A protein has these predicted regions:
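Residue(s) in the substrate-gating loop at a strand-loop-helix junction
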Residues: 147
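Conserved glycine-rich cofactor-binding loop
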Residues: 10, 17-19
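Alpha-helical segment proximal to the catalytic Tyr-Lys
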Residues: 132, 176-180, 239
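Short C-terminal tail/terminal secondary-structure segment
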Residues: 1-2, 98-101, 152, 231, ...
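Active-site loop-to-helix junction immediately N-terminal to the catalytic Tyr of the SDR YXXXK motif
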Residues: 107, 153-161, 173
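Active-site helix of classical SDR
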Residues: 127, 163, 171
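Substrate-binding pocket helix/loop in short-chain dehydrogenase/reductase
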Residues: 102-104, 108-116, 211
Length: 256
């Protein structure tokens, strides 16, 4: 058994038309998996799938656009994946949203509801759609991309952090429930990564210096540096790991 071999495995990655999700999809395909690219907009999904097929061979990737806020669209994502590839071995819940920045007292019910819906409830929906076949097969890896925000307080993105902490607890609970059936559930908690999602932080040189100086590695992360963690959690290399949160943050959470 090769530790990081994903040959014959099928992976669904949400939010995979760009950023961390795209990097994860590319690296899973590189290690042998067939991958499903999914985000809201069809065009970018098609582009990523086409690039993966051009690099690794036709049929290695398909695009199935879906809005994570829609239970019906998530079910279609699962159904079309099974129709194309016959099964789902790996699920990466990466898509998330944050429509509000500011103190908790200022967030509207609609904004808070959207954050919890898209970042927690939608993950729950999709996981429950995919899990029955994994439990029956007694094999599967589910990965939730959380954030170090789920480990810390923050005066500007408190609601987002609440949702990311909930993702970690979701993984822990499901790991306990499904461990006897050899279905593993883990989280990745990235620090600041150079994606469009965090563009407001790294576009400003002064702000970037402010947020990276406390980190031992003194720099921002790249999407591909999160992808390595996903390959590990998806592969046989992590077969004895479940219910955990793998922190990939340049050391910021351990620095004084």
């Amino acid at each position: 058994m090769e530790l990081f071999d994903l040959s014959g495995r099928v992976a669904v990655i949400t939010g995979s038309s760009r950023g961390i999700g795209k990097a994860i999809a590319e690296r899973l395909a590189e290690h042998g998996a067939r991958v499903v690219i999914s985000s809201r907009k069809p065009g970018p999904c098609d582009e990523v799938a086409s690039a993966i097929n051009a690099k690794h061979g036709e049929g290695r990737a398909i695009a199935v656009p879906a809005n994570i806020a829609s239970k019906e669209e998530l079910q279609r994502l699962v159904d079309e994946t099974r129709a194309a590839f016959g099964k789902i071995d790996i699920l990466v819940c990466n898509a998330a949203t944050n429509p509000y920045a500011g103190p908790m007292a200022g967030i509207t019910d609609e904004q808070f509801g959207k954050i919890l819906q898209n970042n927690v409830v939608s993950n729950h929906w999709l996981i429950q759609m995919v899990s029955p076949e994994m439990l029956e097969r007694k094999d599967g890896s589910i990965i939730i991309v959380s954030s170090i925000g789920g480990l810390r307080g923050n005066a500007l993105i408190g609601a987002y952090n609440v949702s990311k902490a909930a993702d970690m607890q979701l993984a822990r609970n499901l790991a306990v429930e499904w461990g006897p059936s050899n279905v593993r559930v883990n989280c990745i908690a990235p620090g600041l990564v150079q994606t469009d999602f965090a563009k407001y932080l790294w576009e400003n040189p002064e702000l970037l210096k402010q947020v990276t100086d406390p980190a031992p590695l003194k720099r921002i992360g790249q999407p591909d540096e999160i992808a390595g963690a996903a390959v590990y959690l998806a592969s046989p290399a992590s077969s004895y790991m479940t219910g955990q949160t793998l922190v990939v943050d340049g050391g910021i959470t351990i620095a004084w």
